[in-house]
């Protein structure tokens, strides 16, 4: 079975807008449903300990929505962030909702957004038991990584299913008009991951402007997770048309990749 690269829409920014007024508008569940109506293959959230955007009730509602609509639910987050008032912790959220995919990300509590991947040599011993636990719940496990990451074979041994390439450096170089060299590095990292049996996802600062070039250069990307750019573009173009524009890019660049 094969299919094109999948689009998972990150709805964090919808929650940011809602929380800015302290009421229920815009409705995160309704926005996610509109993305699914437009053809999105999945929904992504990255709940943080300070509940600056996605909250516990959002995760529960989105889990129910994605299961009812037959699309994937991807929960991102730092598994080492301690539970606290209003935040039960990433593992507790995943245990409760059993998402299709859990993407582990090494972000600090005060970071505005994710900006680096895991160091397998340093953080691997702490990750291994968490990966085992998440896999027991029937969830696919993906690790957020930098281009040129080392230790991919170790990650495969730990039971990791996929990596998510942190594409921020590519987006920056693309904006500057000099992305060829970094694209070659991303392509090499993707191939190395695939050679040891890992699937490859990608995300961070991908947009309508740079997505096609990235997918044209980096082989067999299974999923892209896009939030900030997509929601920003949707302010001008509308949410449903914007999602469809991304799907058009996926169709035109990489119509079929083997699923892992």
Curated annotation (Swiss-Prot):
It is found in: Cytoplasm. InterPro entries: Aldolase_TIM, PyrdxlP_synth_PdxJ, Pyridoxine-5'_phos_synth. It comes from the Bacteria. GO terms for cellular component: cytosol. The active site is at 46 (proton acceptor), 76 (proton acceptor), 204 (proton donor). Signal peptide: none annotated. One of its GO terms (biological process) is pyridoxine biosynthetic process. Its EC number is 2.6.99.2. The record marks 164 as: Transition state stabilizer. One of its GO terms (molecular function) is pyridoxine 5'-phosphate synthase activity. 1-deoxy-D-xylulose 5-phosphate binds at residues 48, 53, 113. SUPFAM superfamilies: Pyridoxine 5'-phosphate synthase (SSF63892). Pathway: Cofactor biosynthesis; pyridoxine 5'-phosphate biosynthesis; pyridoxine 5'-phosphate from D-erythrose 4-phosphate: step 5/5. Catalyzes the complicated ring closure reaction between the two acyclic compounds 1-deoxy-D-xylulose-5-phosphate (DXP) and 3-amino-2-oxopropyl phosphate (1-amino-acetone-3-phosphate or AAP) to form pyridoxine 5'-phosphate (PNP) and inorganic phosphate. NCBIfam families: pdxJ (TIGR00559), PRK05265.1-4 (NF003626). This is Pyridoxine 5'-phosphate synthase. The gene is pdxJ.
């Amino acid at each position: 079975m094969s299919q094109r690269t999948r689009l998972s829409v990150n709805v964090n920014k919808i929650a940011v807008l809602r929380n800015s007024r302290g009421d229920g508008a815009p409705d995160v569940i309704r926005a996610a449903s509109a993305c699914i109506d437009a053809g999105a293959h999945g929904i992504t959230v990255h709940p943080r300990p300070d509940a600056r955007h996605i909250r516990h009730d959002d995760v529960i509602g989105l889990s129910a929505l994605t299961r009812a609509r037959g699309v994937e639910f991807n929960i991102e987050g730092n598994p080492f962030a301690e539970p606290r008032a209003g935040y039960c912790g990433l593992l507790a959220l995943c245990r409760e909702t059993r998402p299709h995919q859990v993407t582990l990300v090494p972000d600090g509590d005060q970071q505005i957004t994710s900006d680096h991947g895991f160091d397998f040599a340093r953080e691997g011993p702490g990750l291994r038991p968490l990966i085992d636990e998440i896999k027991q719940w029937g969830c696919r496990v993906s690790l957020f990584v930098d281009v040129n990451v080392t230790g991919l074979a170790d990650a495969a041994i730990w039971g990791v299913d996929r990596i998510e390439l942190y594409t921020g450096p590519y987006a920056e170089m693309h904006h500057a008009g000099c992305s060829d060299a970094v694209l070659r590095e991303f392509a090499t990292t993707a191939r190395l991951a695939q050679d040891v049996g890992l699937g490859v996802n990608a995300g961070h600062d991908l947009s309508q402007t740079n997505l096609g070039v990235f997918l044209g250069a980096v082989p067999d990307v299974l999923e892209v997770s896009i939030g900030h750019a997509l929601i920003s573009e949707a302010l001008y173009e509308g949410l449903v048309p914007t999602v469809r524009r991304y799907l058009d890019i996926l169709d035109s660049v990489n119509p079929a990749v083997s699923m892992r």
